[in-house]
Amino acid sequence: MTAYIQRSQCISTSLLVVLTTLVSCQIPRDRLSNIGVIVDEGKSLKIAGSHESRYIVLSLVPGVDLENGCGTAQVIQYKSLLNRLLIPLRDALDLQEALITVTNDTTQNAGVPQSRFFGAVIGTIALGVATSAQITAGIALAEAREAKRDIALIKESMTKTHKSVELLQNAVGEQILALKTLQDFVNDEIKPAISELGCETAALRLGIKLTQHYFGLLTAFGSNFGTIGEKSRTLQALSSLYSANITEIMTTIRTGQSNIYDVIYTEQIKGTVIDVDLERYMVTLSVKIPILSEVPGVLIHKASSISYNIDGEEWYVTVPSHILSRASFLGGADITDCVESRLTYICPRDPAQLIPDSQQKCILGDTTRCPVTKVVDSLIPKFAFVNGGVVANRIASTCTCGTGRRPISQDRSKGVAFLTHDNCGLIGVNGVELYANRRGHDATWGVQNLTVGPAIAIRPVDISLNLADATNFLQDSKAELEKARKILSEVGRWYNSRETVITIIVVMVVILVVIIVIVIVLYRLKRSMLMGNPDERIPRDTYTLEPKIRHMYTNGGFDAMAEKR
């Protein structure tokens, strides 16, 4: 098994070297490192599409047909332990089958294999509308029913044989693997021990071995026996528990060696318990092995960025977290749903993403197009590992070298500095001490005059570029703002108080009373003046509307006129 994995690693490594030579030449990693952009060598891309189904039938109790009933008591005790483990699991499977009914609409003829699940219809959901979990359970149930006949045959065969491993291939090419617990141990050790050591001693040995196997069973299948859901299954645990090379048995010629290694490394093999037989103490697992397809000529690079220095100022280049490079394409990669192995990324779909044109040209080496932003806080990374050493912005950091913690500086004309085991050994950055790899080499690819693009806003709303100037302005105007605050605190204090409102009301009432008093006094004064001086009254005839002819009659006016005539 070890040699098999080593061959897979060698083949995958060779393919990766070829792809790296063809594709990674697009990305000038040396030039980007001088502005703090760190890009690794990259890994290949594989798409996990469909899967192959396999079934494993586990016989948990060995066939013990020893003379004089040796080991029978130990087997009974072992079965009682298994009942505690398997009865809840069987009840859950019975409940699932009661909730989901699968009907087959195809015609069953003699000699005609049963149709695949695509011919089956999920008919009735006892609790109402089918949820996604119920549909998934229905699929597993239908697949189990299709393989039920073959599984039943191999179960019957296992009860009649003393082999520890049996393999059956059904009509559609799917393999059913049967593993019998401790059968080789019973055949090779317990039976000979009866004649040599006696029945009692052999039975004790069998009891101890069964107890050990029970705890090994919990270790290998703890996640599967605890739920009927789909869980990752480690074939190495099965191989160790049943002393069989299950990896080679469970794979076919359609799965390449490098794919087998990636599947095992990332633990992508899923197992689900689909049947529990308490009469024979057998458990059936449905195992799904993903089929991987490698995308040729594609590498996914992991990218990161640290701050760098230009003329004493600290800047930061924004790059995608992962870069996908292809012969005619360079963009980002969304690996949210992907699994990373040592040599590849395994994704359910193509993870390629578009990135702005400026970022593409920046990654291709045109640093004048790199989107940069000025660093105004200490949250930006200051160092990173590369080629077994450390690349750091020593101007913005406190760096030491060696066990003596000797302070080191950086040329202000360089964006970053590279530290390795040869020129430093123990590296300290802002109090963090790092030991460089002894095999690491100097990652400086030559001093270059750095020219980067103008500072731009990397988000729709980004004020970080002017934050430093705004901070200085606020510091300069702090005294004036304090004075203005004091003035504003004084203004509005007198008319917003309760005492001020009461005072205003009292003043208005007093003014109103004074006005009323003045009017009354003037009226009385005028009246008293008219009553006290009657001679000064205006003659009545001056203002009367009576005709003056009346006065002529009463005052002798007509007599005077007659005398004149």
From Swiss-Prot:
Location of the region described as Fusion peptide in the Swiss-Prot/TrEMBL record: 117-141
Swiss-Prot/TrEMBL site (Cleavage) positions: 116-117
Record-level GO cellular component terms: host cell plasma membrane; membrane; viral envelope; virion membrane
Intervals, Extracellular compartment: 26-500
Coiled-coil boundaries: 142-170, 466-491
Positions of region (Leucine-zipper): 278-306
BP GO terms, sorted: fusion of virus membrane with host plasma membrane; symbiont entry into host cell
Keywords: Coiled coil, Disulfide bond, Fusion of virus membrane with host cell membrane, Fusion of virus membrane with host membrane, Glycoprotein, Host cell membrane, Host membrane, Membrane, Signal, Transmembrane, Transmembrane helix, Viral envelope protein, Viral penetration into host cytoplasm, Virion, Virus entry into host cell
Keyword Disulfide bond: yes
Membrane topology, from the record: Single-pass type I membrane protein; Single-pass membrane protein
Residue intervals passing through the bilayer: 501-521
Main location: virion
Disulfide bridge positions per record: 70-199, 338-347, 362-370, 401-424
Signal peptide positions (record): 1-25
Family statement: Belongs to the paramyxoviruses fusion glycoprotein family.
Comment, domains: The cytoplasmic region mediates the interaction with HN and M proteins.
Something else known: Sendai virus or recombinant F protein are widely used in cellular biology to fuse cells.
Protein name, UniProt field: Fusion glycoprotein F0
